[in-house]
């Protein structure tokens, strides 16, 4: 591959589910234009402009005997559809998946209505043109529609039909947290393929955090503390907001830090899991 590699690691993979029944061991090399799966006696090239779906999940039943987790890449090449499966565990693969999505949708033109709703109220905000940019945990829209969606705070998303600049379009409606509470942003892309990929990326972030959050038990007092930190920032007077003394606040914060919902490295701040918890519970709290 002549272009520079942005990912290069060794893994087990099934180069093509139509022709291989068992995984092989080899290198996974990615550039800005393609992914190459290279084993001892063969090489499979996946053109990124042909990729129409990417999934990162627990291995389905027929692959569970080979893999615990998988990255499945579906793509078109020479007018045929193919599916490649890569072993999906570990931080290296997590970074690889993010790089794949960045290569697929980064810089794509988007029309965004932000916010389309504040809480349950529809706004009169117009659709504005921008470009997509992905960074760890964030979806940023640059240009006229200048905004950033913290993906850890997404509580719901769906495809809906809306009129955009005089024509009916299918778009993504994303409910997430804004600076003052829940808002909804609507995103329209001209490419159905890229719309599907963006939706898949949002779902991936959403699902992984929800799975982590399902293992965390929170008391009503802990939820109130998380919402107070979100609403007031590192200078929040939790003792005053919660009506408890300083020693109780210290105990609460220690519990939240242990549950990886809060960090105190540079002042009190929510982790991505903590922000997801706020998004899940904020409407249950009246501060």
Curated annotation (Swiss-Prot):
InterPro entries: CheF1/F2, WH-like_DNA-bd_sf, WH_DNA-bd_sf. Disruption phenotype: Deletion has only minimal effects. SUPFAM superfamilies: Winged helix' DNA-binding domain. Gene3D superfamilies: Winged helix-like DNA-binding domain superfamily/Winged helix DNA-binding domain. Keywords: Chemotaxis. One of its GO terms (biological process) is chemotaxis. The keyword Lipoprotein does not apply. Involved in taxis signal transduction. This is Taxis protein CheF2. It comes from Halobacterium salinarum (strain ATCC 29341 / DSM 671 / R1).
